[in-house]
Regions:
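Structural microenvironment flanking redox-active thiols in thiol-disulfide oxidoreductases
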Residues: 68-106, 118-120
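Thiol-/selenol-based redox modules, centered on thioredoxin-like
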Residues: 134-172
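Short, acidic, Ser/Thr-enriched surface-loop or helix-capping motifs
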Residues: 24, 37-38, 115, 141-142
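N-proximal helix/coil linker or "cap" segments that precede and/or mark the start of modular domains
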Residues: 3-32
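Short loop/turn microsegments at loop-to-beta-strand junctions
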Residues: 30-31, 53-54, 135-137
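A short beta-strand-turn-helix
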Residues: 33-53
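Short active-site neighborhood of thiol/selenol oxidoreductases, capturing the structured segment around
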Residues: 48-68
Length: 172
């Protein structure tokens, strides 16, 4: 019985490492991406990286508790983020139409990209194992196109706090 408990504990510790193993790390060049936004427009990483600091965040699903809290939190911080030349882009497997409804309902003021095939999610290593859903992970991409900070937490508040601290470091 003790051996099975130990094996279960070890296995549970290895799963997160395996899930995030292919995720870009601080200092890596951010993977190029392109996706359709809520208005049906094609958005490419080359359109924003180099012009803005990019806060690229992945989240599980529109209209769910934590995802709504996170989106509204970025919305409410947009004034400060814009002053710091930060462009927020959210990514999930949801459709562009669903993103449009989500934006309308919560008055969101930033871009959401539809990633129905998971190409962006997979490029950033954020897919939930075996699912068409992303883990809650945020990447801060500097003007040079390199990853400056990565936050992996189910708690949206941690994303706000860590991203703001990383943005403040860039400004110094």
């Amino acid at each position: 019985m003790k051996l099975s408990s130990v094996l279960l504990a070890v296995f549970s510790l290895l799963i997160p490492a395996a899930v995030f193993a292919d995720m870009p790390k601080v200092g890596d060049v951010a993977p190029a991406f392109q996706g359709t936004d809520q208005d049906g427009n094609l958005v490419k990483s080359s359109d924003v990286i180099g012009k803005n600091i990019v806060l690229l965040y992945f989240y599980p699903k529109d209209f769910t508790g934590g995802c709504t809290k996170e989106a509204c939190g970025f919305r409410d911080r947009m004034g400060d983020l814009q002053k710091d030349n930060v462009k927020v882009i959210g990514v999930s497997f949801d459709s562009a139409d669903k993103h449009k409804s989500f934006i309308a309902k919560y008055n969101l003021n930033f871009t959401l990209l539809a990633d129905p095939d998971g190409k962006i999610t997979d490029a950033y290593g954020t897919r939930m194992m075996g699912m068409k859903m992303a883990n809650r992970v945020s990447f801060l991409i500097g003007l040079d196109g390199k990853i400056v900070h990565v936050t992996k937490s189910g708690n949206p508040q941690v994303h706000f706090t860590e991203m703001q601290a990383a943005i403040d470091q860039i400004k110094k």
